């Protein structure tokens, strides 16, 4: 919906995202494998950018016309993405006039393509329709004043959610922790988790 709005208004889009947790370039996690599905959903041919840092790719991006869409290769093929590298984020920012974040589920991560890149668009950063819906739904509950408030939080890592959890604890009456990160809390409380993975460095905080 967000992409379609931009295209309908005569703009062009450069899509960037990630897939999996590759330590290096992995063909199985390349966006080439999902390119046909994205083109089918959007009903248009995408311009695939293998490496946005190469001059040949930059030239392709410069030539993008109104109502065209480019897709950058999996950003996690670059170690600077998850490191939140400012130089990397600035390079990404240089590709576009505006920044639109439509990924609520990853907005909490201090990565180059989410938190860091926004700093380079002081007056031209926006939220997409999906992100707006998520924020409005949460805000509606918090503003209603109705009690009790139950928050359900899932995810794999406590480390990437601890700030959010601490914030929610100030607003919710009860919190249910699910997903992989639940094992860290169970372990911290003396429970048995077998061979399940947990984050040892967060055991004290999880208590």
What are these regions (language model features)?
Residues 1-207:
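Active-site loop-to-helix "anion-binding N-cap" substructures in soluble metabolic enzymes
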């Amino acid at each position: 919906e967000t992409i379609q709005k931009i295209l309908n208004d005569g703009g062009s889009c450069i899509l960037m995202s990630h897939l999996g947790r590759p330590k290096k370039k992995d063909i199985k996690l390349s966006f080439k494998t999902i390119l046909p599905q994205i083109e089918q959903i959007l009903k248009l041919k995408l311009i695939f950018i293998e490496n946005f840092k190469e001059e040949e790719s930059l030239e392709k991006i410069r030539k993008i016309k109104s109502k065209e869409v480019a897709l950058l290769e999996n950003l996690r093929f670059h170690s600077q993405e998850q490191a939140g590298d400012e130089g990397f984020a600035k390079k990404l920012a240089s590709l576009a006039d505006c920044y639109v974040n439509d990924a609520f589920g990853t907005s909490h991560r201090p990565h180059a393509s989410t938190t860091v890149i926004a700093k380079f668009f002081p007056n031209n950063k926006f939220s997409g329709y999906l992100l707006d819906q998520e924020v409005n739904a949460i805000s509606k509950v918090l503003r209603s004043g109705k009690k009790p408030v139950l928050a359900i939080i899932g995810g794999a890592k406590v480390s990437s959610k601890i700030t959010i959890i601490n914030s929610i604890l100030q607003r919710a009456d009860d919190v249910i922790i699910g997903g992989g990160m639940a094992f860290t809390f169970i372990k911290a409380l003396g429970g048995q988790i077998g061979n399940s993975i947990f984050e040892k460095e967060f055991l004290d905080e999880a208590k």
